[in-house]
Every structure is written in C-alpha cells, then in structure tokens.
Amino acid sequence: MRVLLVGAGGRENAIAEVLARDAELYVVAGHKNPGIARLAKDYALAKETDVPRVLDFALKWGVDMAFIGPEAPLEKGIVNVLEENGVPTVGPTREAAMLETNKAFARWLMEEYKIPGRKLFKVFDDVSEMKSWIDDFGRPVVVKPLGLTGGKGVKVVGYQLKDNEEAKAYAEELIKRDGKVLIEERTDGVEFTFQVFTDGKRVVPMPLAQDYPHAYEGDVGPITGGMGSYSCEDHRLPFITKEDYEKALETLKATVEAMRKNGTPYKGILYGQFMLAKDEPKIIEFNARFGDPEAMNVLPILKRSLVEIGEEIVDGNLKGAEFERKATVVKYIAPKGYPTNPVRGIKLHVDEAKIREEGARVYYASLDENFRMLGSRALAVVGIADSLEEAERIASAGIRHVRGEIFYRKDVGTRESIARRIELVRAMRGE
C-alpha cells in the first residue's frame, strides 16, 4: 500500500509515524522535515498548495491513497483534484473544508440547521452598519476575518482589543482589506479541543485535548499556533462533565449530518474548538484537519491502523477507533522571538537518544534537514504515561536534551495550570 502525505509540520510527523507502520510513505511538502524524511520512501519538495505538482507526484509514485495534513491545500481543492484523478484522499473537498476556510459559512450552517453550541453572529460588508450593530449589541465582541489566518487573525475584546471601540476600528480595517468581516458575541469560559474521524455519516471520537495558544507561561503574550497541549488517561478533561462531553459530541455529529443535508458531505478529520461556557460547550471554530499540536496527543496512542481508518473513511465505511488509556503532554519548542520576530537559520542541537532514554518522543516541525530553524515552532517533545503528572514529567525531562536559541512553556500540562482552568469553570458555574 502506497500512501501520499502532504505537509511537513509536527502534526504531519505524527501522522507519518503511524502511516509508515502499515504503508509505504511518499511525501510532498514545502521543506524537508528530518523526522518525516527518515520514514519516507520518497520525498518531493513543492508548495503544498501547488495542487497540479502534488498531483504529478501522486501519479508518478502510483499512490493508493492520500492524506492531507494542513488546511491551505484543502482550501485549494486538493482533495477534489486528487479524487478526480483516481487517488482516494482522506480530507474534505474544497466545498466541505469551508467549515474551516470560511468562518461565515460555518456560522450560517449552524444557524440554518439549528446545531447546538452555536453563537450569535453577523457578517458585515458595510462599515457604518457594523459600527451601529456593535453599539446596539452593547456587550463585548469577537472580530474575525472570514478566511484562514493560521489562528492569529481573530481578536477578542478584553484580550487583544481593549474595548468595542477598538473592535470597530479593527473590523473596519478587515472590511477595507477583505470586503467582509464576521462579528460574534464573546463567549467566556475555558477552551478545549474535540477531534473526530468521520466518513460523512458516522462520527468516531478521539480523546479530548487542551491547547495552550499563548506564547508565554501563565497564558499571556501573543496567540501562536499552539505552544503545547495535554490529554488525560480517561480521554476526557478534568473540568469536563459527562454531560458537557455528550453535548460537544452531539454538536459535531449534528454538523456532519448538516453537511450531508447541505450537499457538501464532510469526510476526514473534523476538529471542534469549543469554549466550555456556563450553560453548554459553544463552538469557537472548526478545523478541517488534525490540530497541531493536538494530533500529537491522539495519534501516538491510537491502537488501530491509521491506514485502515483512512481506507474506511474514503470508502464511507468507518468502523471505529480505539485509543490506549494513557495521558499525553506535548511541549513545543519555538525559536526565540516567535511568533512576532523569530530567529531563523539557527541550528538546533537535539540529542534524540537521550530524549528516548527519558521515555519521551520527538516530532519535528519548522526545521530543515540540517536542523536549522525556519521561523515557526521547531519541534515538539511528547510524554506519554498512565497519569498526567508522569506524562508531564517525561516531556519536561525530554525537552532538556534540546539546545539552541529557543524557548518553550514549562507550564504546559502542569498540575498548577490545569488547577487554574478547573477553578475558572467552577467559578463560572457557581460551584
């Protein structure tokens, strides 16, 4: 079985590791990831969004199936093109990927099909209408560009924006730049990640995870792609009740069903970013692929073959998935200055043997084959154990064997940081 993987981040290194166990791996990506390269039978350098070139390599190698890692090629219709040319592909079509690539579409779908967990929203193309709506609304808002932003274009009043006046100014900028802007009510609470496999009908849950999007310890600093994440051995999170879990899963199931009814069936991995609000989990946004870092929480403990699951997804015959009852902690290492002004081209020193001795795993990301940093998150160290405390200890021990002009968040997955989140939920719910 020959499988094509598109992408070369930490997420894709985790995908590559599990695919390579059961298939011959072929890769197309924008840079040569050293962790993926050693798993691949062949590796071509090309822009991941250059769909005709990706197709050329897929046909040249005679792959039996393709797996798309990042979101940008999905927006370009890579799944449509590969499938039209006889390559079954795990991932949504361009139309279905709009759940991620067009935030207004996602909000419209939830409203149209009365999907639980939806938020109050409005799309504007007129500056004065937008300003008067925000004034009339009178409560804090969230301002979002409609398209892909790498998780960094969304601004929230009380966080990146001082007040609704600043929100109006930012929204005006976006209307002038993009022609439209999405304004939502601000939802307060604690965020979590719920990823599922789906063949367009059946939805199979993965363990819940929680991401640390802020650059610095204590949840401060600029928003990043994610500085780390954790998951628990019971596959839930310490502040999530069984009822919260069921409601969030129902939102994802209802979304897949709505996509089918809408004539844009969704297959692949669906990622729900939820805010656990006072009354119920609310959708912050959807992603049309695995999370990065959250792929590294779930894939290393997946007991079934990802190749088999992929085949079932493309055949519309998804049977299920099973995960080890283990806790995981992912800690990302980033170049100094990330995300605003990162150092580049500086070599990292990674003692893989020592990392393995600590019981940890390493997944490479924005790093070339000579271990020079390319400007984004460089690599992740993952601890896996029977308890969260032990998984965090392993990840912290492993990360000590990486040297260079780097930083990471020491508080990812720690008892103290999780206790803060539990306390927030209790206070919000008056417990």
Curated annotation (Swiss-Prot):
Binding site for Mn(2+) 2: E285, N287
InterPro entries: ATP-grasp, ATP_grasp_subdomain_1, PreATP-grasp_dom_sf, PRibGlycinamid_synth_ATP-grasp, PRibGlycinamide_synth, PRibGlycinamide_synth_C-dom, PRibGlycinamide_synth_C_sf, PRibGlycinamide_synth_CS
UniProt cross-references to Pfam families, sorted A to Z: GARS_A, GARS_C, GARS_N
Catalytic activity reported: 5-phospho-beta-D-ribosylamine + glycine + ATP = N(1)-(5-phospho-beta-D-ribosyl)glycinamide + ADP + phosphate + H(+)
Key word ATP-binding present: yes
Binding residues for ATP: 134-193
Cofactor binding annotation: Binds 2 magnesium or manganese ions per subunit.
Positions contributing to Mn(2+) 1 binding: Q273, E285
PANTHER family registered for this protein in UniProt: PHOSPHORIBOSYLAMINE--GLYCINE LIGASE, PHOSPHORIBOSYLAMINE--GLYCINE LIGASE, CHLOROPLASTIC
Protein family membership: Belongs to the GARS family.
Name of the protein in question: Phosphoribosylamine--glycine ligase
Origin species: Thermococcus kodakarensis (strain ATCC BAA-918 / JCM 12380 / KOD1) (Pyrococcus kodakaraensis (strain KOD1))
Top-level taxonomy: Archaea, Methanobacteriati, Methanobacteriota, Thermococci, Thermococcales
